[in-house]
């Protein structure tokens, strides 16, 4: 923040850089723990008892959530000042919150790794307000309180920025999504003793995040980048955004019912959940049409080709992961057999990567050259390396999804469909899936190589040369 950056419209946008950098560091950690878990699937005692599978999985999923949150916050700190046409309300507050959130995140992960979970719960006085022990919400209560404090400070900062500046559809949708993210997280503090009731409130956090308000955040970030790289009129893009978020909210909120099939809810949810969750691919399909339409109607050739590729890629991959693979097992008669199988893991991996990891990397790809003082785009070599990273990660994730899908089909065929006496046991079924898990691990290694390419592209210091017209002859 101390040095002037001529490539930023507002100097306070520079606070986004540490958020983006830390997000990518956590992303590397998530992938590494994913590879460890992938190997533990086929080499059961790998790193045991130093790093049990359940601990590796907890770190893997928590890193996913936290790095995406850092990415969303960095995106907001970059786009909100530009959309509001004014400086960020308090850059100093943004930096303070960064260090608070980063410290809380690192300490929590270290706690998972070096302290037995029961001891961690006792150490952090979970008995005063029990919130621990649930998937994705394993954080100690003190960490959850810290997340709420950081979220409130963050929303105050960008909210005050919006109030004193211009109001646009993009910034309003982004703010709505971020407020929803904070509000729905509050359900994490309610942990009823009744397991059926607990599952309802757990899904109010998990589902209404990833299939609800996070889609608003994704839509706003995508719209912002497309405005910048295509030059299409803002009014056209905003109309598309209205349609997309309306579909996302209607299908996403009522579509929560597909999680109510087997947790003790009334039978009507078998129909409601199936019908509305079958409509959930629509907003993702609309995003594909939106991105392709805007690129075809572009009024300028933006020099950052890599960012444009990420913008299109995130819509297509999100539609495949969240739309196609989500629909595969969302209808109640099908979900009866597929629930909790490797097919669920296939959907989860491609959906999270396509919808949220890729949109954060899209934003970083667009913003980082400016944040690093390089102008609109890095040089051609850096972009080639980044494009290699895009294709390696995306193809590898699709391969991971296909291998997990094959594993899920075999698992369902051997373990779920046969009658009780003929069904194969869980562990015996797992032995039959080893080939798919080995292939998944190999694809994961290529994914890591792609991520390294993406990160290495930012080490290039070159920039796109500016062509200056020669002076006219006298």
Curated annotation (Swiss-Prot):
Record organism: Stutzerimonas stutzeri (Pseudomonas stutzeri)
Protein name: Nitric oxide reductase subunit B
Molecular function GO labels: cytochrome-c oxidase activity; heme binding; metal ion binding; nitric oxide reductase activity
Residues binding heme b 1; low-spin, per UniProt: 60, 349
Binding site for Fe cation: 207, 258-259
Example of a GO cellular component annotation carried by this entry: plasma membrane
EC number of this enzyme: 1.7.2.5
UniProt-annotated binding residues for heme b 2; high-spin: 347
PANTHER family found in the cross-reference section: CYTOCHROME C OXIDASE SUBUNIT 1, NITRIC OXIDE REDUCTASE SUBUNIT B
Enzymatic class: oxidoreductase
Domain of life, per lineage: Bacteria
Location relative to the cell: Cell membrane
Membership in a protein family: Belongs to the heme-copper respiratory oxidase family.
Lineage, top ranks: Bacteria, Pseudomonadati, Pseudomonadota, Gammaproteobacteria, Pseudomonadales
UniProt cross-references to InterPro entries, sorted A to Z: Cyt_c_oxase-like_su1_dom, Cyt_c_oxase-like_su1_sf, Cyt_C_Oxase_1, Cyt_c_Oxase_su1_BS
Catalysis performed (reactions): nitrous oxide + 2 Fe(III)-[cytochrome c] + H2O = 2 nitric oxide + 2 Fe(II)-[cytochrome c] + 2 H(+)
Self-association state and partner proteins as the record states: Heterodimer of cytochromes b (large subunit) and c (small subunit).
């Amino acid at each position: 923040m101390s040095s002037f950056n001529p490539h930023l419209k507002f100097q306070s946008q520079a606070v986004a850089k540490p958020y983006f950098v830390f997000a990518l560091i956590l992303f590397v950690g998530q992938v590494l723990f994913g590879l460890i878990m992938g190997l533990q699937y086929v080499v059961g005692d790998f790193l045991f008892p130093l790093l049990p599978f359940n601990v590796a999985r907890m770190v893997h999923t928590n890193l996913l959530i936290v790095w995406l949150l850092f990415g969303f916050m960095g995106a907001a700190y970059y786009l909100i000042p530009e959309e509001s046409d004014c400086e960020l309300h308090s850059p100093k507050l943004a930096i303070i919150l960064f260090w608070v959130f980063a410290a809380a995140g690192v300490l929590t992960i270290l706690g998972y790794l070096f302290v037995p979970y029961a001891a961690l719960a006792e150490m952090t006085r979970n008995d005063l307000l029990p919130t621990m022990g649930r998937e994705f919400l394993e954080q100690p209560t003190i960490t959850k309180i810290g997340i709420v404090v950081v979220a409130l400070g963050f929303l105050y900062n960008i909210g005050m920025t919006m109030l004193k500046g211009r109001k646009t559809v993009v910034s309003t949708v982004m703010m709505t999504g971020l407020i929803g993210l904070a509000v729905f997280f509050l359900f994490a503090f309610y942990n009823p003793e009744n397991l059926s009731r607990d599952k309802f409130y757990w899904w109010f956090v998990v589902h209404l995040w990833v299939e609800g308000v996070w889609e608003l955040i994704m839509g706003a970030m995508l719209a912002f980048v497309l405005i910048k790289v295509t030059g299409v009129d803002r009014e056209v893009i905003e109309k598309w955004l209205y349609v997309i978020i309306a579909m996302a909210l209607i299908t996403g909120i009522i579509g929560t019912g597909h999680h109510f099939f087997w947790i003790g809810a009334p039978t009507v949810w078998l129909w409601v959940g199936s019908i509305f969750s079958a409509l959930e691919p629509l907003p993702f399909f609309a995003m594909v049409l939106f991105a392709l339409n805007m690129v075809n109607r572009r009024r300028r050739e933006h020099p950052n080709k890599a960012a444009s590729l990420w913008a299109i890629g995130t819509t297509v991959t999100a539609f495949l992961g969240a739309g196609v693979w989500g629909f595969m097992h969302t209808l109640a008669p099908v979900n009866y057999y597929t629930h909790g199988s490797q097919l669920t893991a296939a959907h989860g991996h491609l959906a999270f990567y396509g919808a949220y990891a890729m949109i954060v990397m899209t934003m970083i790809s667009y913003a980082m050259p400016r944040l690093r003082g390089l102008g609109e785009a890095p040089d051609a070599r850096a972009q080639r390396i980044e494009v290699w990273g895009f294709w390696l990660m995306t193809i590898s994730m699709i391969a991971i999804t296909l291998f997990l899908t094959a594993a899920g089909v075999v698992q369902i065929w051997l373990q779920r469909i046969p009658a009780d006496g003929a069904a194969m046991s869980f562990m015996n079924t797992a032995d039959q899936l080893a080939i798919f898990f080995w292939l998944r691990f190999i694809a994961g290694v290529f994914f890591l190589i792609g991520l390294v390419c993406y990160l290495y592209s930012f080490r290039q210091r070159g920039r796109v040369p500016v062509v200056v017209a020669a002076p006219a002859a006298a």
